[in-house]
From Swiss-Prot:
This is Glutamyl-tRNA(Gln) amidotransferase subunit A. The lineage of its organism: Bacteria, Pseudomonadati, Pseudomonadota, Betaproteobacteria, Neisseriales. One of its GO terms (molecular function) is ATP binding. The gene is gatA. InterPro entries: Amidase (IPR000120), Amidase_CS (IPR020556), Amidase_dom (IPR023631), AS_sf (IPR036928), GatA (IPR004412). It comes from the Bacteria. It catalyses: L-glutamyl-tRNA(Gln) + L-glutamine + ATP + H2O = L-glutaminyl-tRNA(Gln) + L-glutamate + ADP + phosphate + H(+). Allows the formation of correctly charged Gln-tRNA(Gln) through the transamidation of misacylated Glu-tRNA(Gln) in organisms which lack glutaminyl-tRNA synthetase. The reaction takes place in the presence of glutamine and ATP through an activated gamma-phospho-Glu-tRNA(Gln). It is an enzyme of class 6 (ligase). The active site is at K76 (charge relay system), S151 (charge relay system), S175 (acyl-ester intermediate). One of its GO terms (biological process) is translation. Transmembrane segments: none annotated. Its EC number is 6.3.5.7. Heterotrimer of A, B and C subunits. PANTHER family: GLUTAMYL-TRNA(GLN) AMIDOTRANSFERASE SUBUNIT A, TRANSAMIDASE.
Length: 481
């Protein structure tokens, strides 16, 4: 029962071939069996889940259901929900129960979806491997010696392991797309401002964006229909007419122009990634898409620009965690200043501390112009590059990561880890939508994904192209043993 896609589960629930309680119980049983080894979930509340499932069954019986009523969903530990712990995988918020619900979570609750739990992540969404979690690293379900990616690694892992039909993630510099690639699932980062950030704990506010993660592009489109929309509680939310993100799913690829950035098809990609790209190019050609070369010359500068800007915003956003009103507080201190220092030293992990220090440094007197202001100018140049490219094409095909998932505990420096986001970060700098879909496997049997990037608010076009690729391939249908 846990092998269904989100769409299949919804159809079976609506036709009353299965009940929401039966489906939720099947997932809870699978989680109890597999999660201790996977560590994909860090919070489960069986009573709350089954209560939501019973309410969904009542709604279906009354004929008042949506296509998503009764379908289970997992939430990254960064999304608030009344009565649920959301710790952002940090000691700082360990056992903190939020008194309110994120808008995007409420949207799915209004549809009647059933909460399965909170998924593991890099602390405060800062990381690319899911090793920066206070609750221990999540494992890649294809090979537990490897990382699932990050920061939404737990969400990717539970969907790939069929411990949830879908999950929510957040993407600040690739945190939906990179773990989706490493775990062999589909995930989309929408245009910045498409999905409300209210109730999603902030890392870097001008980058953060929530998005769906599921087995297929069709599932992501269905979920995004429920997630997206204007929210007056979020000052960065776009006020636009409601869209149907499934509208292009049946549109053929014939005549669609696909841009291939010459900077992204480099010697730095592993053979596995090159093969995955060629697999996708062959599929696109076979369906009549036109391939054109484009250039994104500022890509090489996107990583330093991103880490200056995101760290500056993180340093500001995380200043609220001081032990005064909520969260961890040091047990022993002499005065208020010592309490602040000890609380933050004890509550934050090493990667979070590193980024806070970088952010404080680049915003300090004498360095603001040299780093922060220059990074903002680079951000504009990156966005301009994409607009130049989209004048020649409809969508851009690119790698998601330079290689398949690395091993847990791999001896890599922070800078080497940051470089693994080389192909995802530019999209966040520009605020564009992008989707990762499975496109092959490494020699070691690990999934490899590619990404499709579109212009602003082109989510339906991206999802349609991805769906057409998936209709003619089966990588998305593979699952770990």
């Amino acid at each position: 029962m846990t092998q269904y896609t989100l769409k299949q589960a919804g159809s079976l629930l609506q036709s009353k071939q299965i009940s929401a309680v039966e489906l939720a119980s099947a997932y809870l049983a699978a989680i109890a069996e597999k999660n201790p080894a996977l560590n994909g979930y860090i919070t489960i509340d069986q009573d709350k889940t089954l209560a939501e499932a019973r309410a969904a069954d009542e709604r279906i019986a009354q004929g008042n259901a949506s296509a998503l009523t009764g379908v289970p969903v997992a939430y990254k530990d960064i999304f608030c929900q009344t009565g649920w712990r959301s710790a952002c995988a940090s000691k700082m918020l360990d056992n903190f129960i939020f008194p309110y619900t994120a808008t995007v979570v409420q949207n799915l609750l209004d549809e009647g979806m059933v909460t399965l739990g909170r998924t593991n992540m890099d602390e405060f969404a800062m990381g690319s491997t899911n090793e920066n979690s206070f609750y221990g690293a999540a494992k890649n379900p294809w090979n537990p010696e490897h990382v699932p990616g990050g920061s939404s690694g737990g969400s990717a892992a539970v969907v790939a392991a069929r411990l949830a039909p879908a999950a929510l993630g957040s993407d600040t510099g690739g945190s939906i797309r990179q773990p989706a690639s490493h775990c062999g699932i589909t995930g989309i980062k929408p245009t910045y401002g498409t999905v409300s950030r209210f109730g999603m704990v902030a890392y870097a506010s001008s980058f953060d964006q929530a998005g769906p993660m599921a087995q297929t592009a069709e599932d992501c489109a269905i979920l995004l229909n429920a997630m997206a929309g204007f929210d007056p509680k979020d000052s960065t939310s776009f006020e636009r007419e409601k869209e149907d993100y499934t509208r292009d799913l049946d549109k053929p690829l014939k005549g669609v122009k696909i841009g291939l950035p010459k900077e992204y098809f480099s010697e730095g990609n592993s053979t596995d990634v090159q093969t995955a790209l060629q697999n996708t190019i062959d599929l696109l050609k076979a369906q009549g898409a036109e391939l054109v070369e484009v250039s994104l010359p500022q890509t090489k500068l996107s990583i330093p620009a991103y880490y200056v800007l995101a760290s500056a915003e993180a340093g500001t956003n995380l200043s609220r965690y001081d032990g005064v009103r909520y969260g961890h507080r040091a047990a022993q201190f002499g005065d208020l200043e010592e309490m602040y220092g000890k609380t933050r030293a004890e509550g934050f992990g090493s990667e979070v501390k590193r980024r806070i220090m970088i952010g404080t440094y680049v915003l300090s007197h004498g360095y603001y112009d040299a780093y922060y202001l220059k990074a903002q100018k680079l951000r504009r140049l990156v966005a301009d590059d994409f607009q130049t490219a989209f004048a020649r094409c409809d969508l851009i095909l690119a790698p998601t990561a330079p290689s398949a998932a690395p091993k847990i505990g791999a001896d890599t420096s922070p800078v080497e880890t940051y470089l693994s986001d080389i192909y995802t970060i530019a999209v966040n700098l520009a605020g564009l939508p992008a989707l990762t879909l499975p496109a092959g496997f490494s020699g070691g049997g690990l999934p490899v994904g590619v990404q499709l990037v579109g212009n602003y608010f082109a989510e339906a076009k991206i999802l349609g192209a991805a769906h057409q690729i998936q209709l003619n391939s089966d990588w998305h249908g593979k699952r770990p043993e």
